[in-house]
Regions:
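A short helix-breaking turn/cap at a secondary-structure junction
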Residues: 59-118
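Short glycine/serine-rich loop/turn segments
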Residues: 1-80
Length: 118
């Protein structure tokens, strides 16, 4: 929601919600305004907008992607993840954003499991 533009709508049906706190990201990808977006999720904020807007989005395992500068809600659930038009693009984005961050202790083991997800 924005004070300027109001409620984010599903670009496929403007009478419907875009779903969740990362709805702007999902709607922007679905409307071809951007080829990718990064959503943040505690419980459904990536996967709901992805599903409702017809794009690819998933919640990576906590600790695989840094949470630095993400507003904390739940340290055991918060993470960031990709929203794209294709599975291959989502895998490529995850390959780029996954890794260790000294500012986020949860990512200490990320390099050990990190791989090329494409």
């Amino acid at each position: 929601w924005s004070a300027v533009g109001g409620l984010t709508r599903n670009p496929h049906d403007l009478t419907r919600s875009a779903c969740g706190s990362s709805s702007g990201s999902g709607a922007a990808v679905a409307a071809f305004l951007t080829p990718l977006a990064i959503g943040t999720e505690t419980d459904g904020s990536i996967v709901c907008p992805a599903g409702i807007n017809g794009v690819v989005g998933f919640k990576p395992t906590v600790g695989l992607v840094s949470r630095t500068h993400i507003v904390p809600i739940s340290s055991s659930q918060d993470t960031a993840g990709p929203m794209t038009l294709t599975v291959a693009d989502a895998a490529a984005v995850l390959t780029i954003i996954a890794g260790t961050d000294r500012a986020d202790r949860a990512t200490a083991m990320a390099r050990e499991v990190q791989q090329d997800y494409v």
